[in-house]
A protein has these predicted regions:
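Hydrophobic alpha-helical membrane-association signature
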Residues: 64-68, 117-120, 150
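Glycine- (often His-adjacent) and acidic-residue-rich active-site loop
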Residues: 9, 15-18, 88-124, 143, ...
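CoA-thioester-processing core
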Residues: 124, 128-130, 138, 144-177
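Hydrophobic/aromatic residues within transmembrane alpha-helices
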Residues: 49, 86, 99, 150-151
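Conserved CoA-thioester-binding segment of acyl-CoA-metabolizing enzymes
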Residues: 1-89, 112, 126
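Ligand-binding pocket scaffold of soluble enzyme catalytic domains
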Residues: 46, 107, 162
């Protein structure tokens, strides 16, 4: 930051909601921004947010939804971050939606709990939409169901050659709204 020599650099307030954004199943990393020639741009970063549940095609659990919300908010607040890359671990899937194992074990038969979960999911979509930085969805493999919905909330998508996109809900009597 360039400040006149007689003026001190300003101390900025921390606007993050929590100090620790770490949640199981979500990885967050700041990577240095690079110029087209590959050289690093000093003091400028890209935030990388990974869904990390490759054994279940990066389907998101309740904790992962919370982690994405916190990570998007932190990236949005980080003055040194210029964009967000949102992706999934591995090459099989960006995300296949909600974790059906968690649905079956906890949410089945508990409509009030499921309503709270869906509210949290909507908050995740809102966090992506509200991010002050461009959000790039990096699609590796499948982007299905709720994964398609969160991917569409991003500013744009970049997909590998074998990426697959789809919506599972209509086959089961539901559709995104």
């Amino acid at each position: 930051m360039n400040a006149p020599e007689n003026l001190p650099l300003r101390d900025f307030k921390n606007h993050d909601l929590v100090d620790d954004i770490g949640k199981p199943g979500v990885r967050v990393e700041r990577r240095p921004a690079r110029r087209p020639d590959g050289s690093v741009v000093p003091g400028l970063y890209n935030a990388w947010i990974w869904l990390d549940n490759p054994g279940q095609y990066n389907s998101y659990t309740t904790d992962m939804v919370k982690g994405v919300i916190l990570a998007m908010r932190a990236a949005s607040n980080d003055r040194a971050v210029n964009c967000v890359v949102f992706t999934g671990v591995g090459d099989k899937a960006f995300c296949t939606g909600g974790n059906t194992k968690e649905y079956a074990e906890y949410y089945a038969g508990q409509p009030q709990e499921y309503r709270q979960y869906m509210r949290l999911f909507n908050d995740m979509v809102s966090a992506i939409l509200a991010c002050d930085k461009p959000v790039i969805c990096r699609v590796n493999g499948m982007r299905i169901g709720g994964g398609q919905e969160i991917g569409m909330a991003c500013d744009f998508s970049v997909a590998q050659d074998l990426a697959r996109f789809g919506q599972a809900g209509p086959k089961h009597g539901s559709a995104p709204i």
